[in-house]
Amino acid sequence: MKTFWGGLILGLAAVPVLGIAYVLSGYAPAAVADRPVPLEQFLAGAALAARIHREAPQRDLAGFTDADLVAGANVYRRSCGCHGLPDSPRRGPRPVTFPTPPQLFTPDGYVTDDPVGVSYWKVKNGIRLTGMPSFKSVLSDEQMWQVAALVAKADKLPKEALDVLKQPPVPAPAAAPPANATKLQK
């Protein structure tokens, strides 16, 4: 009986040791193009769902006005390019991110079934290991709610909000030359 218990303890101790050895060996998938290891997506998704369920605030979507949706569209256009725009090609780092950011203005990408508080939580906190940043230090609380309401109503936006989203992209400002550029040229 001692041999059984000793073998069981040794076997259980070997699992984390072998897992750590696998990760440290350099063979574990770490590049964006690598296939995920078994259970990776399940565990990450389950952790995210549980956290959101516990922390997402409750708010009634009916309380948002068309003006809120237009304001949300302006913020979305500036900050949410990875998730696409209506009738527009995707902007942002799609080919180099894992998982690929969902396109929120395509019928299969709508998050209109998500409560607005869930979208707000994602905007505020970001999503670990996905490339989705936290906007809590960039946007005001009101702006985060406006964006959350916008994506919650993505399939039935007022014309004014759609007009904002369909405007041509604003080109990025040209970079200024370094302060010491003239010294470098001499």
How should these model regions be labeled?
Residues 60, 65, 85-87, 103-106, ...:
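Short, solvent-exposed coil/turn linker segments
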